[in-house]
């Protein structure tokens, strides 16, 4: 029980955290269930096993290189049983000897001097290090120091600078790239000895311009028959053998290396050749994480549109001849598979026995693209070698070309990968892999107006002589040099493109269309379409076509739940990008820009996406009633700001922020889709001239603050949004509130317009939503005893709720704004077009927002009904 107590930490609100498994539970029963679960029990057993092994082991050095484990075992058996010996196979300078019991270890250590074959041995206890659970390790590509990331992003000048800084923090350093080049050169040198004329091509994250710290090293071993003869410009030059050996020599302390904790499926420490073969084959998933950047993310099927047509000769063959040739083809295919499997085993044997520093080698012939997985100890890299993945090589070159064509591609992809990872949208299984997410970003950039990137079909047409390539029957032709292509005329800033991406994806028909990068537009999956046109293409909840292998839906593994969650998260992110918190750097030290987007998803953020319905009443009256409910009934402190509008037809370029705080009107676009018209360059959520205004009320926002963002003349500034303004607006036309841009002329001749979306920042110092029913019942009983009836009008109901709030606050809390920080603060946003209210947390250090949001979902609709009746 003591061990369990040391693993469990109590958290606020009755929650618990298991530090061993890196798991947080909501209550004590959930904690008890976790502690009895298989994951926790396995890790407890693994920790005990590692500790026992360490207590039985000794570190041995000083023996000659030609001494093997058998000789060491024979010597140490004189002191007691030997359970295991782990040799340093690379340099042969140390070994870990695990004795059968502690008494045998003590007998070894009690011997003052040890010698073997005339050489003195240095024997000392194995260093004991704190057990590190595999669950507590940082995900690949995530900076271990989150504080450094937060600080760097907070100090950036704007959102675009934050995105560029994120790339700098996550991309490989020059030293890491050189190390990978050395490993590739080492592989090239070794494989050339066995396969003269072969070429080792790196692909995936290493060369597609979207590398991150710790990404896998994916290699394609080309045995020949390449369509293009010139060498890969990204392939490293092979240095001399001596320089390779010295460059890859490990500088790690062997004692520390041997004591480094491993995952539950790893061996004790750096294993010998025999141990790597015997220990690792049971656990194919543990060897090296699959690289999503390669085209191996999901299963592929045969192409519908792009399958080569059946020739007339084949159609005229007789059935008997067809059957005979089918049998011959099956036999030939079987022979080819057996031959490929034999070559794969040969490659694995070469890696095991001939490449210094390589261990945990495993052949995986059953994969869609058969590979040999390996680990390289001196560099710490995981990787795989494939023999038939030339298409992925061109996919990587295509991604690299896209990043070279426009400097905004890399920051946008890095930011969205990080956002998806922190929101649990990318990864293995049913989640989006990085390759699919990158293609989704490229598709989005193809659909801008004007486009940021050309379509694949346009790139194919611009391929020059010598760049026409066909791989596995697919056209992979595109220019190699981005400087030959005309730059995009789209000059939108990164912050605007990021906001547009969220708006675009949240409105896409992911299941009813096929997003085609070759065409740069969605191909509608209409009902009644002949099945033979789609034969081989695996349609699903999300359909994203590979740029070259048109039979491959790179998002075929994504489930309906994940696709729906992707669009939900994009919708919430799009709403956030319309706020000043995204657009402006905080002067009060609060998170701004990218930082809230990159925070892990929480119950608060998920709840903020749930909408609260508003009654179908004139919007100015609804706004006024909402203010009364928040301020009078609940005692919220609402900090006011300025209401502003922009001139009609204002373009994105008029604002340094690209107008991302506007809400778009998409009626015209939706109509065009209903009529069956193509919208090849458009995407729902894009900026257009037909936009409606959004009014935002921000904390302590002054006209001077707005002048920094607004390019219009000062006389466009409108008065504060107060109850008097709302009263006048309602009196002006109580039954038909006007949308911005549709105003009428008042007595002064100036246009009177009403916003279509209003936001408030609210702060609470007391938990006025808890115990409210009990307090109301008590006050109603007092009113009844005094001979007064219950509330019959909206004003009486509001007065009663204000008394309930005061009762919950206590007798000594009559100040509108008490001193000190509020208990929590939130943003309430009302939308006229959607007739909904969105509530999102701003500051919630105690985790109280979920309870408040649950209360508001039932309280707000009933309160507005009472006030507006």
Curated annotation (Swiss-Prot):
Posttranslational modification: Phosphorylated by CK1 in the proline-rich (Pro-rich) region.
How is the protein's activity regulated, according to its record? Adenylyltransferase activity is specifically phosphatidylinositol 4,5-bisphosphate (PtdIns(4,5)P2).
Q: Which residues form the PAP-associated domain?
A: 494-552
A single Gene Ontology CC term: nuclear speck
Which species does this protein come from? Answer: Mus musculus
Copy out the cofactor comment: Binds 1 divalent cation per subunit.
Record's protein name? Speckle targeted PIP5K1A-regulated poly(A) polymerase
Q: Which leading EC class covers this enzyme?
A: transferase
UniProt domain comment: The zinc-finger domain is required for terminal uridylyltransferase activity. Together with the RRM domain, binds the 5'-area of U6 snRNA. The RRM domain is required for terminal uridylyltransferase activity. Together with the zinc-finger domain, binds the 5'-area of U6 snRNA.
Q: Could you state a single Gene Ontology molecular function term?
A: mRNA 3'-UTR binding
Gene of this entry: Tut1
Assembly information from the UniProt record: Associates with the cleavage and polyadenylation specificity factor (CPSF) complex. Interacts with CPSF1 and CPSF3; the interaction is direct. Interacts with PIP5K1A.
């Amino acid at each position: 029980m003591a061990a369990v107590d040391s693993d469990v930490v109590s958290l606020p609100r009755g929650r618990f955290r298991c530090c061993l498994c890196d798991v947080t539970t909501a209550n004590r029963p959930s904690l008890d269930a976790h502690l009895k679960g298989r994951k926790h029990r396995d890790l407890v057993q693994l920790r005990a096993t590692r500790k026992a092994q360490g207590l039985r082991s000794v570190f041995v050095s000083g023996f000659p290189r030609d001494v093997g484990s058998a000789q060491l075992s024979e010597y140490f058996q004189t002191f007691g049983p030997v359970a295991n010996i782990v040799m340093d196979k690379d340099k042969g300078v140390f070994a870990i000897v695990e004795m059968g019991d502690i008494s045998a270890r003590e007998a070894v250590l009690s011997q003052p001097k040890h010698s073997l074959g005339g050489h003195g041995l240095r024997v000392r206890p194995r260093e004991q290090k704190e057990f590190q659970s595999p669950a507590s390790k940082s995900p690949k590509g995530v900076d271990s120091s989150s504080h450094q990331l937060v600080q760097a992003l907070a100090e950036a000048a704007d959102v675009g600078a934050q995105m560029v800084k994120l790339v700098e923090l996550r991309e490989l350093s020059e030293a890491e790239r050189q190390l990978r080049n050395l490993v590739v050169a080492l592989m090239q040198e070794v494989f050339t000895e066995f396969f003269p004329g072969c070429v080792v091509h790196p692909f995936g994250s290493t060369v597609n311009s979207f590398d991150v710290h710790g990404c896998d090293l994916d290699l394609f071993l080309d045995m020949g028959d390449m369509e293009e003869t010139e060498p890969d410009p990204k392939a490293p030059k092979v240095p001399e053998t001596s320089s390779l050996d010295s460059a890859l020599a490990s500088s790690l302390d062997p004692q520390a290396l041997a004591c480094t904790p491993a995952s539950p499926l790893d061996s004790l420490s750096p294993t010998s050749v025999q141990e790597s073969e015997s220990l690792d084959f049971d656990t194919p998933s543990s060897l090296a994480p699959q690289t999503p950047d390669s085209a191996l993310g999901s299963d592929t099927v045969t192409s519908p549109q792009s399958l080569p047509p059946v020739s007339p000769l084949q159609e005229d063959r007789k059935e008997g001849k067809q059957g005979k040739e089918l049998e011959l083809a099956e036999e030939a295919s079987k022979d080819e598979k057996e031959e490929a499997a034999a070559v794969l085993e040969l490659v694995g044997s070469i890696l095991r026995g001939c490449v210094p520093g390589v261990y945990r080698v495993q052949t995986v012939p059953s994969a869609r693209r058969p590979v040999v997985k390996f680990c390289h100890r001196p560099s710490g890299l995981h990787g795989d070698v494939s023999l038939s993945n030339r298409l992925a090589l061109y996919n990587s070159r295509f991604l690299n070309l896209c990043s070279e064509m426009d400097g905004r591609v890399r920051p946008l992809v890095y930011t969205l990968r990080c956002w998806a990872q922190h929101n649990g949208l990318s990864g293995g299984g049913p989640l989006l892999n990085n390759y699919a997410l990158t293609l989704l970003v490229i598709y989005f950039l193809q659909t801008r107006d004007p486009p940021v990137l050309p379509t694949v079909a346009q790139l194919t047409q611009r391929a020059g002589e010598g760049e026409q390539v066909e791989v596995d029957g697919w056209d992979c032709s595109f220019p190699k040099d981005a400087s030959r292509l005309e730059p995009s005329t789209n000059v939108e800033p990164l912050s605007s493109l990021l906001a547009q991406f969220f708006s675009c994806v949240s409105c896409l028909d992911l299941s009813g269309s096929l997003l085609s990068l070759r065409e740069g537009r969605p191909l509608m999956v209409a009902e009644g379409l002949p099945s033979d046109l789609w034969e081989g293409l695996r349609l699903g909840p999300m359909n994203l076509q590979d740029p070259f292998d048109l039979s491959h839906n790179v998002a075929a593994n994504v489930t309906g739940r994940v696709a729906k969650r992707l669009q939900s998260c994009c919708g919430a992110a799009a709403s956030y990008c319309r706020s000043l918190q995204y657009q402006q750097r905080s002067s009060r030290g609060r998170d701004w820009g990218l930082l809230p987007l990159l925070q892990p998803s929480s119950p608060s953020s998920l709840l903020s996406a749930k909408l609260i319905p508003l009654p179908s009443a004139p919007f100015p009256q609804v706004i006024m009633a909402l203010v009364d409910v928040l301020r009078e009934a609940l005692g919220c402190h609402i900090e006011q700001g300025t209401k502003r509008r922009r001139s009609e037809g204002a373009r994105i370029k008029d604002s340094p922020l690209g107008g991302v705080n506007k809400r778009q009107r998409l009626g015209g676009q939706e109509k065009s889709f209903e009529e069956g018209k193509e919208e090849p360059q458009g995407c729902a959520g894009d900026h257009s001239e037909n936009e409606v205004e959004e009014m935002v009320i921000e904390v302590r926002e002054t006209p001077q603050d707005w002048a920094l963002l607004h390019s219009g003349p000062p006389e466009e500034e409108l008065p504060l949004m107060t109850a008097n303004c709302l009263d006048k607006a309602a009196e002006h036309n109580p039954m038909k509130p006007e949308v911005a841009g549709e105003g009428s002329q008042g007595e002064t001749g100036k246009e009177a317009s009403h916003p279509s979306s209003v936001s408030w920042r609210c702060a609470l110092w007391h938990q006025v939503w808890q115990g409210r029913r009990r307090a109301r019942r008590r006050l109603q009983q007092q009113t009844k005893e005094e001979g007064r009836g219950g509330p019959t009008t909206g004003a009486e109901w509001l007065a009663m709720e204000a008394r309930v709030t005061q009762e919950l606050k206590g007798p000594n809390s009559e100040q509108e704004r008490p001193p000190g920080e509020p208990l929590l603060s939130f943003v309430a946003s009302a939308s006229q077009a959607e007739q909904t209210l969105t509530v999102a947390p701003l500051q919630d250090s105690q985790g109280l927002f979920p309870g408040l949001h649950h209360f508001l979902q039932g309280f707000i609709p009933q309160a507005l009904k009472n006030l507006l009746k």
